């Protein structure tokens, strides 16, 4: 080897060590790291492959979700790599889960584009979930720094303004989803809307998969639905509404549908989670500019949020959607037909509604969070609930929620209007009992029976659904306390 080659080789080796080096030795593991107020923090539940050290697995997650690749590259020397490397700083074993660990990772704020959920998620969940070194991986929680949150608009309207527009205070908002989801003509669809609103509901809504199919194009549905809204408002003297689903194949189509809804006098439009983060943020910006309420159906979330070992906890989706700017999001019922452990659901609701939250491990909240004055995002409870559960719903979910009774309204034997009346009476009698200081939780069934003595539709509903419960064990439960799912 010539002297010149030897010199170049020596200089190169002094500048950086080439080849494949463990991530922990490359600077992605730092147990002494001092967390900055501006850091984005993420907590992963990680099950490493057999033989993989959990610290190395955590460092690999930090590396592959920030600056690293599988081998050392000389272009690291051209960047402020010590700054831009994510730092895994803590690894804890998961209680009652062998060979599974909580991995805490800190990301410098400059790794992310301001106000871009797509960019944030491209790093945090973009690549590492297919990493061979881990058998399973789940994003459990995140802390968003104040400085980052100030680059997001948050909910366009917020709960307080929505209550003022509806003139509804001191109780949950009451609604229903039109059933059947698919197949109705526009005229019959509008009839369902009118009957439900006339019976006492505040809103009705489209379901996630009703868009603009051959049996009913969106214009027809929007026209007949708003006719029902206006008629019911005139008859009842109350402010009414209907969540018109503007979900479509392209942004151009969604804007067109949302504008049509606005032109018809609607105060709210709806989108589905499956349209993607960029589309959600785009629609949220449109909603704020046009002074519209934006409802989000979480369609598709359980494909990655339900299983405890792999995917993403729904509380992270709640945080991202509050940042993105939606006003409503479906967040669970506890007692309904869909997945929902009581403590986990409480954590979701607190994430959406509180301006500041502390660490609460039983609820799955691993980080304290200051929401930088972003408005509240209203949780929606929907799926398999009925008026006989009203005391449980108010106990678990409180007032700041939209209760959606689909089958529990439209399945009433005496018709849609009767179903709506049963739900309205059940809600109001339970709120009155609570406000009077009664033990409405234990006395709930009797409170409902007493109200039903003067409300035939409520009595019919209680007789029909009195034995309907969904007592299945939740798959996503707290790691730090036993929380059996039961409808008591």
From Swiss-Prot:
Mg(2+) binds at residues 205, 207-208. Disulfide bonds: none annotated. Substrate binds at residues 127, 177, 181, 298, 330, 382. It is found in: Plastid, Chloroplast. Keywords: Calvin cycle, Carbon dioxide fixation, Chloroplast, Lyase, Magnesium, Metal-binding, Monooxygenase, Oxidoreductase, Photorespiration, Photosynthesis, Plastid. Its main location: plastid. GO terms for molecular function: magnesium ion binding; monooxygenase activity; ribulose-bisphosphate carboxylase activity. Its EC number is 4.1.1.39. GO terms for biological process: reductive pentose-phosphate cycle. The record marks 337 as: Transition state stabilizer. The modification N6-carboxylysine is found at residue 205. Binds 1 Mg(2+) ion per subunit. Its cofactor is Mg(2+). The active site is at 179 (proton acceptor), 297 (proton acceptor). InterPro entries: RuBisCO, RuBisCo_large_chain_AS, RuBisCO_lsu_C, RuBisCO_lsu_C_sf, RuBisCO_lsu_fd_N, RuBisCO_lsu_N_sf, RuBisCO_lsuI. GO terms for cellular component: chloroplast. It catalyses: 2 (2R)-3-phosphoglycerate + 2 H(+) = D-ribulose 1,5-bisphosphate + CO2 + H2O; D-ribulose 1,5-bisphosphate + O2 = 2-phosphoglycolate + (2R)-3-phosphoglycerate + 2 H(+). Signal peptide: none annotated. PROSITE patterns: RUBISCO_LARGE. Heterohexadecamer of 8 large chains and 8 small chains. Belongs to the RuBisCO large chain family. Type I subfamily. RuBisCO catalyzes two reactions: the carboxylation of D-ribulose 1,5-bisphosphate, the primary event in carbon dioxide fixation, as well as the oxidative fragmentation of the pentose substrate in the photorespiration process. Both reactions occur simultaneously and in competition at the same active site. The basic functional RuBisCO is composed of a large chain homodimer in a 'head-to-tail' conformation. In form I RuBisCO this homodimer is arranged in a barrel-like tetramer with the small subunits forming a tetrameric 'cap' on each end of the 'barrel'. This is Ribulose bisphosphate carboxylase large chain. It comes from Chrysotila carterae (Marine alga).
